Amino acid sequence: MAVITKIEVQKRSKERFNIYIDKGQGEEYGFSVNEVILIKHGLQKGLEIDEIALGNILYNEEVQKAYLQAISYLSYQMRTKLEIEDFLRKKEVGQAIISEVVSKLLHDRYINDKEYAILYTRTQSNVNRKGPTVIKRELLNKGVQDLIITHSLQEYPKEKQIENALILIEKKKKSYQKHSFLQMKLKLDEMLVRKGYSRDVIQICLEELKDEKDDEKQREALHYHGNKYYEKYKKYDGWTFENKMKQALYRKGFSIDEIEIFLQMKREEG
């Protein structure tokens, strides 16, 4: 049995208190607690506490400490239930305490996976223009349940997906000016897949791109690559030269007809 002999406010934190006790051998430092725990257990000078009571006090102090750590972590941005659990595990908090903290956070509505999923979907679609497949995968990795994700993705209709994909295409295609139209389409297709768009949405967007095909830019790309390969393979003669040129330009996405026109032009120049 111990008796509380003194309670003093810590110098560095006005919300924490040092508790001094006497176990029959004079006053000594016992432990420190948060103000919440001080009030919860009615700690005051003269109070007698046994080992069981002390164990409860210290356990609740650990819960309160972990709770405040979680609140601080949440102050930067919203988090999912799993993210909070992982954060506390990294802080080497025990599972029993983690469960209590998460339960309290859920009760106090500091964490709500449904609200998180909806806001995350809106942000990733409107700001980062990610497709639904990537958004779903990221939410799953954050521990959000599949049913909640399905509900949140209703915030991202197909029309909006197409709009975002077309914006991404418009931005990215400028970097493919020296590619054949076919190769540009393939690269844009790969980009949209990485961004998380469905095959259906990609097909619709690339069909629109087909209508914008620029013959002049296609010729410029053909001449750019054709002249590069011409310098590379001009040391070869006849069939070998033409075969290497055709293979190289075909791999770049140019049609046989386009390649023949280019080679004919080179013959006439020669």
UniProtKB/Swiss-Prot annotation:
Main location: cytoplasm
Keyword field: Cytoplasm
GO terms for biological process, alphabetical: regulation of DNA repair
GO cellular component terms attached to this protein's record: cytoplasm
Signal peptide span: none
Localization: Cytoplasm
Coiled-coil stretches noted in the UniProt entry, renumbered to this chain: none
InterPro entries hit by this protein: RecX_HTH_1st, RecX_HTH_2nd, RecX_HTH_3rd, Regulatory_RecX, WH-like_DNA-bd_sf
Superkingdom classification of source: Bacteria
Pfam family, one: RecX_HTH2
Family assignment from sequence similarity: Belongs to the RecX family.
Classification via NCBIfam families: PRK14135.1
Entry-linked HAMAP family: RecX
PANTHER family (UniProt xref): REGULATORY PROTEIN RECX FAMILY PROTEIN (PTHR33602:SF1)
Annotated function: Modulates RecA activity.
Name recorded for this polypeptide: Regulatory protein RecX
Protein source organism: Bacillus cereus (strain AH187)
Recorded name of the encoding gene: recX
